[in-house]
Amino acid sequence: MHRLTLAQIARGLAAKEFSSVELSEALLARIAELDPGLNSFITVTAEQALEQARAADARRAAGESGALLGAPIAHKDLFCTKGVRTSCASKILDDFIAPYDATVVERLAAAGCVSLGKLNMDEFAMGSASESSHYGPVRNPWNTECVPGGSSGGSAAAVAARLVPAATGSDTGGSIRQPAALTNLTGLKPTYGRVSRWGMIAYASSLDQGGPLARSAEDCALLLSAMAGFDPKDSTCVDQPVDDYLAALHRPLAGLRIGLPREYFGAGLDPRLSDAVMACVEELKKLGATVKEIGLPSMQHAIPAYYVIAPAEASSNLSRFDGVRFGYRCENPQSLEDLYKRSRGEGFGAEVKRRIMVGTYALSAGYYDAYYLKAQKIRRLIRSDFIGAFQEVDLILGPTTPNPAWKLGEKGDDPVAAYLEDIYTITANLAGIPGLSMPAGFVDGLPVGVQLLAPYFQESRLLNVAHQYQQATDWHQRAPEGY
């Protein structure tokens, strides 16, 4: 049963080939057996999951139907889950039990999803390797000596290892798409404002967006159908009609105009990965697409701009973790200042502290104009580049990452080397457009992904192209050995 995709599970449950309880029990046994070697889960909610599965089976028996009714999933551990620890993979929130469900959690539960637990990640979603977690690094099931990507690495590893058919993630600079690429999954970052951020613990509020990781575009469409939509509790959530993502999957690609940005194929890209991207392009041409080269000139400034804006917002967002209201509190503080200093100093990990300091510096009076204001101007230029490009093409295609997965600890001493792994993904967050990564082959036995970018609220187009490509290829069906 663990080999079934979300869509196959939906069909199996509807045909009464198995029950949600049977499926959940099988996956929980698999998590207990295999996850110690991967460390993808922080919290497994076995009792709650079986309770939800029994309720889903009862709803089906009473005549209710629904594609996700009784389907198992798991949540990245920055989505608040009522009565269950929500840690953000940080010592500072190690004992935080959320008093409410995030909107994403609430909507998937209403659709009948069974949550098997909370997934490991980079601390406060800051990282590209899932190595900075207070609970230890996550391992990539394709090679357990390698990272699974980040920050949604636990989500990616758990789905790739068939511990759970699909998972939620969040994407601030590539944190859904990059781990999806490194673990042979399909990962979607929706348009900023398409999915509610209410109850999703913030890293950088103008960049964060929740989305699905799954084994196919069809599975992502199923999840996004339940997750998307206006939420009055989130002031950044856009009141825009939700497309029929499942119906859109089957559109032919004849006449689709694809743009290849010349800036994506320069120095720093593994040439074997470039070959995989071009093979994908040839496949899409066979399906009726046309391809042309385009320019995104401001992309060269994206990483410096992102690493000013994101830490600046993080320094503000993370100021709430002060040892007073909730979360970790140091022992025997000598004064209020000592309480703040020691609670934060002992509670946050090295990468989080690094980004808080960078962000505070960028926002300080003497440097605000030189750094933060300039970064926001670059952000506007990047957005203008995309708006211009989408007047010429329907979709932009390129590599998701410059390299396949690297070894655990390899980039630990060089934060900038890790930051450069996000070079192709962060522009979508800065512009707010949707992006999807899909499996496109292997380099040295490790998966690589192709990224698709579309205009605002065109998630259905991304899912359509990915689904048609997945009908013509079988990369996405390949599983890591032993899983």
Swiss-Prot record:
Subunit structure: Heterotrimer of A, B and C subunits.
Gene: gatA
Source species of the chain: Azotobacter vinelandii (strain DJ / ATCC BAA-1303)
Protein name: Glutamyl-tRNA(Gln) amidotransferase subunit A
Described function: Allows the formation of correctly charged Gln-tRNA(Gln) through the transamidation of misacylated Glu-tRNA(Gln) in organisms which lack glutaminyl-tRNA synthetase. The reaction takes place in the presence of glutamine and ATP through an activated gamma-phospho-Glu-tRNA(Gln).
Any single GO CC term annotated in Swiss-Prot or TrEMBL for this entry: glutamyl-tRNA(Gln) amidotransferase complex
E.C. code: 6.3.5.7
Catalytic activity, reaction form: L-glutamyl-tRNA(Gln) + L-glutamine + ATP + H2O = L-glutaminyl-tRNA(Gln) + L-glutamate + ADP + phosphate + H(+)
Keyword Glycoprotein in record: no
Biological process according to GO: translation
PANTHER family per UniProt: GLUTAMYL-TRNA(GLN) AMIDOTRANSFERASE SUBUNIT A, TRANSAMIDASE
